[in-house]
Regions:
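Secondary-structure capping and boundary motifs in well-ordered enzyme cores
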Residues: 60-61, 120-129, 173-181
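Alpha-helical support elements that line or immediately flank enzyme active sites
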Residues: 69-82, 122-146, 186-193
């Protein structure tokens, strides 16, 4: 191509298989229209960030505020595919901060009456000290997130017997100490936001 040519690439990811990646591509990357994709991304972010409106302050302060909100919503990534499959890497031997001899499994999320997965599975950094900030802010602006994340964490525990501290690609990382995910799950329940998993089942996982 010439130096003035534009090069376009569509890219998707699957944690399960190349076949699933191709299916994700067909579902999620349906156009070569770059401007249309950009507008859709802007509309999506405006919808999420626009749930909290601020007035006053300088343009620089407002920019910083919404940049911080963007970070609040970043860092947790779906690992399930369009067909509902996701990797389970919880079955192995713990060795310090790692899991050895992992037996990789592919699991499939259940679907509701409308054919949608009941919740998504997520990667996430640890929830260390988020009871002071993230848990509260999510509950105010994005109440579906504590519900989604709690359901994901509970399913990790169903698969591997532990509620993850920082779930990664369907497995455990053993980062931090204690169980920083617990305040998030309890917060979702106390606020009446836990709808995608059974609270009693979640409680029994701690016994």
């Amino acid at each position: 191509s010439s130096a003035a040519s534009d090069v376009y690439k569509r890219q998707v990811v699957s944690y399960v298989s190349t076949e699933n990646a191709r299916e994700n591509l067909t579902h999620d990357a349906t156009t070569w229209d770059f401007d249309a994709v950009r507008r859709a991304a802007q509309d999506e972010w405006n919808e999420w960030l626009g749930r909290i409106e601020v007035k006053g302050g300088t343009q620089q302060q407002r920019t910083k505020f919404y940049t911080d909100l963007w970070h609040v919503l970043l860092g947790r990534h779906k690992i399930d595919d369009v067909n509902g499959e996701y990797p389970d890497l919880t079955d192995g031997q713990r060795a310090g901060s790692f899991t050895r001899d992992i037996r990789v499994k592919t699991r499939t999320l259940p679907r509701d009456a409308a054919g949608r997965v009941v919740h998504h599975m997520y990667n996430s950094d640890a929830f260390w000290l988020t009871q002071w900030n993230l848990n509260v802010l999510w509950g105010l602006g994005w109440p579906e997130m504590p519900d989604e994340m709690s359901a994901s964490l509970i399913r990790y525990a169903d698969n591997g017997g532990l509620i993850p501290r920082g779930p990664c690609a369907g497995g455990y990382t053993y980062i931090m100490s204690g169980c920083p995910a617990t305040p998030l799950i309890v917060s979702a329940y106390n606020k009446g936001l836990m709808r995608k998993c059974d609270p009693m089942h979640a409680c029994l996982l701690y016994t």
